[in-house]
Amino acid sequence: MATKLDKPLFLFPTVASNCASVTAISVMYHPDGTFREDYYPNLPEHTFIHTGIIAGSPYALLWAGIGDALSKECEAVFASKGATLKFEPLMGVQLSKVCTEPLLMYGAQALAACREKRVTPELEQVVLDIIVATGLVSNMTTRIPEYYYNSSLAHCVYNGATATQFGGRHLHGEIVALGVLCLLTYDGQLEQRNRIMAFNHQIGLPVCFDELDIDESEFEAIAKRTQAGAEWQFRAPDITEESFIQCMRQQNQAGRAFLAAMQQRGG
């Protein structure tokens, strides 16, 4: 509305489920909940964050926010690979490299604080990571139609999952967290994938599609639906529908094997 009326916009996020309150990107959906398109409004003039309010917000939304923020570094680096970057997107990609580690280091403690509705340094660190750090990266790495390095295969998984039978039951960041593992699998970053897979399992984020009630028979529908998004339209030429489906299959197998091993250990 502020964009259409050409009015200044001030935002006051009450949850830390994503970076929307700092960015100029809005995701639009069809009435049935399936992904429709991305919309690019004007940036907010300022975003006011009260961590006391966010500490009292639903636990699941902070949990999903961690899953969403986990995607920022791997997607920005992956999407910009091989590109000659101008100053602003170059700065954005470099900034993305500070997004992952605070989540892995403080994420579990931040969730514990949220469960108890307490503001702690760990909670503040994670909230600012989810909302501010990833939001700034988003703004610096998006200039359609010139370039789009903001997100990639992890969000392709989410966009497509909205077309599955039960994908709508799950939160955005919950699905993106699994998409991160798919991207790292596709890119051959198996050590980092396994590290994040262990973290996901620690805090209850998914490591395979079974945990999202998505069957492998739906992977083709995911690949078809996601093609409406900027992530797919700005992908590298070597990423095909078939290779995307294959990386989802590979991660599903890896996640199942991980869960089986954890069950044997009693973890």
Identify the residue ranges that each predicted region occupies:
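Short hydrophobic "helix-edge" motifs at membrane interfaces and signal-peptide entry regions
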Residues: T3-K4, Y40-P41, I144-E146, A230-E231
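Active-site segments that bind and position negatively charged phosphate/pyrophosphate groups
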Residues: K86-A198
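A glycine/threonine-rich phosphate-anchoring loop and its flanking beta-alpha core
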Residues: K4-S96
